[in-house]
Amino acid sequence: MRLLPIAILSACLAASMAAAQVPTAPPATQAVLHDIAAAPSAERIEADIRKLVSFGTRHTLSETESDTRGIGAARRWIHAEFERISAQCGGCLEVIDVGDTISGEERIPDPTEVVSMLAIQRGTADPDRYVIMSGDIDSRVSDVMDFTSDSPGANDNAYGVAGTLEAARILSKHKFPGTIVYAALSGEEQGLFGGKIVAAK
């Protein structure tokens, strides 16, 4: 029976040695990660969601000329937010619109510009390695072809876009080895077109 305590002691010793060999982040890195984790603001995220909802509808086929209603207004506001965030970090973000004309599809029968907004934070050591955070801009009611009715889309997917904006605000204050792409995608409810267009670029 004396072998059992010895076996248990040996197992514990081996486990502690294995744990000691696992590399841990240096204290400075741990402090940065703690700061990042504590930085998101529920108030800012809610304000962004409410702003996106205020455009009435963000349907892919909706109004693009108005500055207060439709997907065009939402796109311009998101682009401006990315630019504002970039200005606060000394131009650390490349803000671009990526789009294409889609037509002849069941949910996009007529020629329609599907435009997504990207903010790219280039990596310092491995810029060809990408991490992408995205939310889709567009919203819809039950009838996927109804582009005039209000479709606030707070949970599908204004909160995803708001989370992406908040991530850009926080992470752009730091430098990372790889590249981070913050993306607000259009045309997702009509067939994931925004993501496809961005991936093709």
What is each of the regions a protein language model found here?
Residues 31-40, 58-72, 104-108, 146-157, ...:
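Second-shell loop/turn segments in exported
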Residues 28-35, 40, 44-47, 51, ...:
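Extracytoplasmic/secreted proteins, especially bacterial periplasmic and envelope-associated proteins
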Residues 43-47, 89-93, 126-131, 176-181:
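Loop/turn elements at helix/coil->beta-strand transitions in domains of secreted/extracellular proteins
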Residues 57-60, 101-105, 124-126, 137-141, ...:
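Solvent-exposed loop/turn segments at secondary-structure junctions
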Residues 108-115, 141, 146-201:
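Acidic/histidine-rich catalytic neighborhood of metal-dependent amide-processing enzymes
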Residues 36, 47-122:
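A non-catalytic alpha/beta surface segment that caps or lines the substrate-entry region
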Residues 5-16:
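Bacterial N-terminal signal peptides
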Residues 18-21:
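Boundary at the C-terminal end of the N-terminal hydrophobic targeting segment
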